């Protein structure tokens, strides 16, 4: 059974590569986003992962920066099931065979860490994308954790929403056993684990629910990017605690939506 699911994943990856190579050059933004969402839903379904949206789900189609805690390489596809976004990733990912090219074709913005000039370039690109109506998703911790804590947020990229005059949307991610609701570390891409090792852990685990909790949009304050980063982290920490059952959910209508129904199955 595990071998068949791995084969299905390989075929699904090939389908994604062909879609990007053959169709994407001829498609508009809306149709590309439909394909990205559909492909991501199918990937998660093969992995045995369902999606649950919790809290006041933000209005789609408006430019903003989404900030979230980072647990797994699955995070990107989980977020795509809600709304396809532009992600900021380290430049090394671009050199990964096949996957790097796939990320580039789906709009990932790559940054060379440690190069100040490149950080300025990426800030400019993020600002432009948001002003054009795109959601840009960043993981300000700069690394992955097992989900038990939220590391301090780096502040550099927070300059982009300040410059654009657009909001920051705090989001918390949590993976749990679909049957018991208990937190699972199977998807955690941490320490010396490789991508294939985490994939094996996911495929061997019981069905998983990926929870996405949304907070209220944050506006830039007079304190600048450092204050905005700290405020965003506080919001994400509060959301994580809510997911763990230690605090009430944020105001708004809660929603529990399976991945298969988060979007229409027909491109607009």
Task: Cite the ranges covered by each PLM segment.
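Polar-ligand-bearing catalytic/cofactor-coordination segments
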Residues: 110-112, 215-221, 233-235, 268
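Soluble extracytoplasmic domains of inner/organellar membrane proteins
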Residues: 119, 126-127, 131-158, 162
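Cytosolic-facing loops and C-terminal tails of multi-pass membrane proteins
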Residues: 226, 231-268
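A transmembrane-helix-recognition feature enriched in membrane-embedded lipid enzymes
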Residues: 1-52, 101-106, 205
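Conserved H-X4-D acyltransferase segment
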Residues: 2-5, 36-91, 102, 146
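A cross-family acyltransferase "interaction/gating" segment
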Residues: 98-100, 148-223, 227, 231, ...
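Membrane-embedded segments
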Residues: 74-125, 130, 134
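Residue-level preference for the first positions of well-ordered beta-strands
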Residues: 63-65, 108, 135-139, 167, ...
